[in-house]
Amino acid sequence: MDRAIDIDFRTISVVGLGYIGLPTATVLASRQREVIGVDINQHAVDTINQGRIHIVEPDLDMLVRAAVSQGYLRATTEPEPADAFLIAVPTPFLDNKQPDLSYIEAAARAIAPVLKRGDLVVLESTSPVGATEQLSDWLSAQRPDLSFPHQQGEESDIRVAHCPERVLPGHVLRELVENDRIIGGMTPKCSEAAQRLYELFVRGRCIVTDARTAEMCKLTENAFRDVNIAFANELSMICDEIGVNVWELISVANRHPRVNILQPGPGVGGHCIAVDPWFIVDAAPESARLIRTAREVNDAKPHYVLDRVKQAARRFKEPVIACFGLSFKANIDDLRESPAIEIVQTMVQQQLGTVLVVEPHIKVLPAALQGVELLNAEAALSRADIVVLLVDHQQFRKLDTDRLQSRVVIDTRGMWSAKRIAA
């Protein structure tokens, strides 16, 4: 019988136990498979083995506690033999906007010694086109006794595929199960093996393609969103110049049946939309002109917000600035590539005034924000001359906007402004 069809995936290893890896490992464990989570962060490993979590994601704590107590999930810092390996490590970009694949290479070096004939390796990390082939090459360099798809094609000992995550923070557990998945194997048998694995827990469609198309698919999805956000952000700056309320404008423009303008903000953050388009630009710099421009527009938006804060600060002798929200999107604790972090950090560096932060989803400010106070909303409002809304957390919607009347308000998300329009 074909090895791909015969594979049973009794033991599955997930390398990288962050915002994607840990929920994926937990969902697999809930299907009563033995799951070995691997992470270089000893604190994360210890926390998980105690049945607790080191990240914020709704309902994840209960599932991890159950999976660990039932013996289906455990974490370690060193890879162990398994039937399938899912790599979910970061893929940031370097200072020159080129992709940094060092985490993927490190994962390949870590799992290579425990690979055996018939194993499946899946790259889940969002990656530039060609990264899955590079992963196969790195693995083969460590294990010349095994054959890999870029060498032996369908007859390889090890199957290698790419299956990018496509989940929304705050809804990860539901979307891991319900969303369609794009599965791109380096060969048809690689795709078949990966499809078998994901069908253990995915209720959505598993759509099979090749590895390069799967890689480009995820980049395309995020570049599409980035371009549309850039349109909204640019529109907000134009409206400020010509004296039009952008929130009201978007609301009425979206009444057109074929118009759906997104909401502007202080920039674009997170580990996907703020990063992935650069992978396309790096691969085809002369052709990716619109994608590059969208990235530049969104990267420039924090500076635009800062200019507005500077103008407001000139009205006060010793301004106190309260910044509401630090995460890259609403209702999560993830600060990766957050424009709010950049804005607050620059306020401190440029000494615009006393800077306060309200971020209900974290207990300690990042080291980059030394000199900033973390307060609750009431304490911050009682001291603030200027209030800057950077993230539209649900908690901030409950704020009595009458409390803002005597303060300068810079609402980058339209949350309080929209309430006033509706009223």
UniProtKB/Swiss-Prot annotation:
Superkingdom per UniProt: Bacteria
Binding site for NAD(+): 11-28
GO molecular function: NAD binding; oxidoreductase activity, acting on the CH-CH group of donors, NAD or NADP as acceptor; oxidoreductase activity, acting on the CH-OH group of donors, NAD or NADP as acceptor
Any Pfam family matching the protein: UDPG_MGDP_dh_C
EC number, UniProt record: 1.1.1.-
InterPro entries hit by this protein: 6-PGluconate_DH-like_C_sf, NAD(P)-bd_dom_sf, UDP-Glc/GDP-Man, UDP-Glc/GDP-Man_DH_C, UDP-Glc/GDP-Man_DH_C_sf, UDP-Glc/GDP-Man_DH_dimer, UDP-Glc/GDP-Man_DH_N, UDP_ManNAc/GlcNAc_DH
Gene3D superfamilies: Cytochrome c1, transmembrane anchor, C-terminal (1.20.5.100), NAD(P)-binding Rossmann-like Domain (3.40.50.720)
Entries under SUPFAM superfamilies matching the protein: 6-phosphogluconate dehydrogenase C-terminal domain-like, NAD(P)-binding Rossmann-fold domains, UDP-glucose/GDP-mannose dehydrogenase C-terminal domain
Record GO biological process: lipopolysaccharide biosynthetic process
Active-site residues annotated for this sequence: 218 (proton donor/acceptor), 272 (nucleophile)
Keywords of this entry: Lipopolysaccharide biosynthesis, NAD, Oxidoreductase, Plasmid
UniProt function note: Probably involved in the synthesis of sugar components of EPS I, by converting NDP-N-acetyl-D-galactosamine into NDP-N-acetyl-D-galactosaminuronic acid.
Assigned protein family: Belongs to the UDP-glucose/GDP-mannose dehydrogenase family.
Protein name: NDP-N-acetyl-D-galactosaminuronic acid dehydrogenase
Species classification: Bacteria, Pseudomonadati, Pseudomonadota, Betaproteobacteria, Burkholderiales
